[in-house]
């Protein structure tokens, strides 16, 4: 255990030697919101928007495979590049080993700019060492012509497009410029070239939207969740594929329930990470004892990451309720500050909850794990 702690502390020190900056944004009105639970529906809508692009396309993506889904996106991009659209792609090359170098080299030959998150030539020494052992660019950003933006949990691969359930949101309007500015932060850190000029965006709707972006060592998400839980008066519904929150967020969930807020958590019965199955199960009796209602989905794996509270605030993005998302990875989320958008997210949550089983106090903790081992799992996951 001491060895793991030492390694983690060394990595954290290396992060601190290479500070990163991320822009902060205020809520902006004049947007429209569209959301889907279907990977295929997302892909079809995205391909339509790509086909209609006139000037620029930016993508910052965690996972971009060279399979059927990935090639559909690539082919659409190739077509637009040949038409003169400026395309920039930032991809986490650590998590996309299924896409060989020539796959992205083909994109470069078509005139696209492709940069890797773990670009050792662009990193300071500390960050270069830490990158392969620590942070991932978990963002899933697409911005088209500076006025349309997408984010959510869906990657460009067959599994997340055609098999899993997930939530993806599309905004159109001035808030898309915030997502583009967040992309520019990563691009400036890891790629060559000056930032693209800003594109004026006219209001097209009524949604009040705020972009939230984080980098390693950032405390933004912890403060955000603690604040929104403290502000909740009637309910706070949260869906996440993984549950291993920072202590402050776990306590904020319990405190809200103790005040009489209807706090509900929803996650899959089994996730794609066996380690996280054990960790998530370990929390369930503790959550129920604190007055939090826990719902488990046992159908097709649902990878959604969202919350909604009091019909007034909601969020959807790439953020899992775990230590990596809150402290280590690069993440993004959209906050919706208007009632209409919050109700859309609420409806999505309740539709999934209707297919869930509510857990009770008899739910067993992770089988086969001693108390000491469960405690160790919690601690090590918060650190890494």
What are these regions (language model features)?
Residues 8-16:
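Bacterial N-terminal signal peptides
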Residues 4, 16-384:
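Charged, low-complexity intrinsically disordered terminal segments
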Residues 1-7:
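Bacterial N-terminal signal peptides that target proteins for export
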